[in-house]
């Protein structure tokens, strides 16, 4: 089965480069790629699980819309050419987006006109509204709306029209403006101005509350993310673990899932989560509190620097979920020397993951599974469990 996209057929949008390929073929191609990448590793004790499949449409919980056109007729989508406003493509009917976004787009287009949010013109470096960012929580259908603006000039007008907007769209629970003054291809700036009392969305995966905040990373395919975290939980729940680290922990998805399962058998389990982004650590702390988990410590630090400076308190399990570049040679070598009993490695880049695993000479690859987090593209997530030889 293939997904038919009119924007791809007319070459207006080429983001989903594999969308014309049958889904089974996409999965098979990704599995072959993964097997090719890990070929240099010892697989004598490796157990493969079948790829975790995604829905093929309506799976994406986030919409990042470039705003162009005229204030009375805004276009929400992409610019094929940053310097040519006439190259705008309206993607409000994108097949990837959650159905919850569909009724929102026309109301937002009307709101842009009412509030006088002139779309930013890259070529002329004029205008105010650069992007509209939407994020949906599947837990209660709540939505976060963010306006990315060049300046604070239009903030009073947004406030003036906000009550009408919320009346039409009561599902908008978090609304903010992000100020990005630079004339550069940068999505967001440092300053966030909230128009609502609430500043986070609550999501729930496997009955564990997770929180989404502006400027924080959260997986864009919640169905597959829930499967990924749930699988990690199942893999570790019966392991002899008393202390675990969750490095590059983000909002705490992996660590909280694992700690909750482990603490049900041993309440003295200790979790330390490390992430450089303060907003993510704030969300992770909220989750731990709402879960009622004890002996949990989340810190806003560089994950590699934290690990490399630990002389004592060796963990039994280390979870790593690094960015595409991987954990890097120094951290991989440190873990190899420290020798925790188990390492759970989640990666969005099998090439860098394999480089890291080759440094872990004291470890045996035990389990592996591909998660199709990004359908219709060549990208995927992979989860592996390693045990000390």
UniProtKB/Swiss-Prot annotation:
One of its GO terms (biological process) is rRNA base methylation. It catalyses: uridine(747) in 23S rRNA + S-adenosyl-L-methionine = 5-methyluridine(747) in 23S rRNA + S-adenosyl-L-homocysteine + H(+). NCBIfam families: meth_trns_rumB (TIGR02085). Belongs to the class I-like SAM-binding methyltransferase superfamily. RNA M5U methyltransferase family. RlmC subfamily. Keywords: 4Fe-4S, Iron, Iron-sulfur, Metal-binding, Methyltransferase, rRNA processing, S-adenosyl-L-methionine, Transferase. The keyword S-adenosyl-L-methionine applies. S-adenosyl-L-methionine binds at residues 219, 248, 275, 321. The gene is rlmC. The lineage of its organism: Bacteria, Pseudomonadati, Pseudomonadota, Gammaproteobacteria, Pasteurellales. Disulfide bonds: none annotated. It is an enzyme of class 2 (transferase). GO terms for molecular function: 4 iron, 4 sulfur cluster binding; iron ion binding; rRNA (uridine-C5-)-methyltransferase activity. [4Fe-4S] cluster binds at residues 5, 13, 16, 94. The active site is at residue 348. Catalyzes the formation of 5-methyl-uridine at position 747 (m5U747) in 23S rRNA. Its EC number is 2.1.1.189. It comes from the Bacteria. Pfam families: tRNA_U5-meth_tr. This is 23S rRNA (uracil(747)-C(5))-methyltransferase RlmC.
């Amino acid at each position: 089965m293939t997904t038919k996209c009119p924007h791809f057929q007319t070459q207006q949008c080429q983001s989903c480069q594999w969308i014309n390929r049958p889904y089974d073929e996409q999965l098979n191609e990704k599995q072959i790629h993964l097997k090719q990448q890990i070929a240099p590793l010892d697989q004598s004790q490796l157990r493969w699980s079948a790829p975790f499949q995604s829905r093929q449409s309506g799976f994406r919980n986030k919409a990042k819309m470039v705003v162009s056109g005229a204030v009375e007729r805004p276009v929400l989508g992409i610019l094929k050419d940053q310097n040519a406003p006439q190259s705008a493509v309206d993607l409000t009917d994108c097949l990837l987006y959650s159905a919850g976004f569909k009724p929102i787009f026309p109301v937002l287009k009307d709101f842009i006109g009412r509030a006088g949010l002139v779309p930013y013109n890259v070529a002329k470096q004029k205008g105010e509204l650069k992007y509209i960012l939407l994020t949906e929580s599947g837990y209660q259908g709540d939505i976060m709306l963010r306006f990315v603006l060049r300046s604070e000039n239009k903030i009073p007008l947004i406030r003036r029209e906000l009550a009408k907007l919320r009346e039409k769209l009561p599902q908008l629970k978090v609304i903010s403006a992000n100020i990005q003054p630079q004339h550069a291809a940068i999505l967001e700036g440092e300053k966030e101005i909230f128009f609502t009392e609430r500043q986070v969305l609550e999501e729930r995966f496997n009955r564990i509350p997770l929180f989404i905040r502006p400027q924080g990373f959260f997986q864009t395919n919640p169905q597959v993310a829930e499967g990924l975290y749930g699988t990690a939980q199942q893999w570790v729940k019966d392991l002899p673990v008393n202390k675990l680290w969750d490095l590059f922990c983000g909002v705490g998805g992996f660590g909280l899932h694992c700690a909750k399962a482990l603490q049900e058998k041993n309440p003295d389990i200790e979790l330390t989560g490390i992430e450089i982004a303060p907003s993510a650590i704030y969300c992770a702390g909220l989750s731990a509190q709402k879960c009622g988990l004890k002996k949990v410590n989340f810190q806003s630090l560089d994950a590699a620097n934290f690990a490399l400076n630990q002389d004592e308190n060796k963990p039994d399990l280390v979870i790593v979920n690094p960015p595409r570049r991987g954990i890097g040679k120094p951290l991989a070598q440190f873990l190899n020397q420290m020798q925790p009993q188990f390492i759970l490695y989640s990666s969005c880049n099998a090439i860098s993951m394999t480089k890291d695993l080759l440094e872990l000479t004291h470890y045996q690859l035990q389990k592996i599974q591909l998660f199709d987090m990004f359908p219709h593209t060549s990208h995927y997530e992979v989860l592996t469990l390693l045990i000390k030889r």
